Amino acid sequence: MFNLLKLVAKHRHLVKSRYESFLISNGHAILSNQSVIEIRDLHKAYGDLEVLKGVDITANRGDVVSLIGSSGSGKSTLLRCCNLLENSQRGEMRFKGEQISWIGKKHDRRPSDPKQVLRIRTNLSMVFQQFNLWAHMTILQNVMEAPVTVLKRDPSEVESAARAYLDKVDIGDKCDSYPAQLSGGQQQRAAIARALCMEPEALLFDEPTSALDPELEQEVVKVIKDLASEGRTMLIVTHDMQLAADVSDYVVFLHQGLIEEQGVPKTVFGSPTSERLRGFISAAHAIQ
């Protein structure tokens, strides 16, 4: 099925998974003192449309967790709730053991501490599908903007770091270019450098390759693989099953706002138990 079993067998996490500390009891994750992100019983609705119906997920330090599933399954909403770009209606959220505090009505809550929100957002850097670079700024200025403006860091120090991160993603020669002068793959790599320049605890990728053609997609995939090999904590929403198999310590399959199946890549892709997951993998294989 999908011939991913051979693929995942090559990778480090099947020899010794860094996700061994992710424990399951009665279908629920046990909290770990190594965790960066912990979510319990998360619910999110838009009016009468319930998008997340009670999701539990944990990402421990150094783990790469991929969220897969059909469009509309709740993957991107879950990621945006992690970063507090969306407010959930119910459930517990913790960042490095610190519980998010809420105010407001039960089904219309919001975080109560703006400083806590800023602290969490700056430590959970998002990489968006559509890059979201400022068109009027150079690539270097885009990467420097948040650390200087939001974190009030010294501009000269930030510039040195920004140039280093642009070199890291192989576009160090594009510092003075504007987004419109770059290919889609280069823009996404600039967005990754921007996220890294915040020095976050974790990176959150929302479909980082879906807006790219296959050739440009591989440029971004290489960067993500390199980051995974460094042991960075990452949550990745993706339709790219090969990417998920390559880099993940743990894969979560969502269906209609619930976790349908989860496990290490070898199990999820090689021995799926859910009929929905088997169908999803087969469909993804047919498309690719």
Describe every region a protein language model picked out:
Residues Q262-G263:
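ABC ATPase "signature
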Residues I68-S70:
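The feature captures the beta-strand-to-loop junction immediately N-terminal to the Walker
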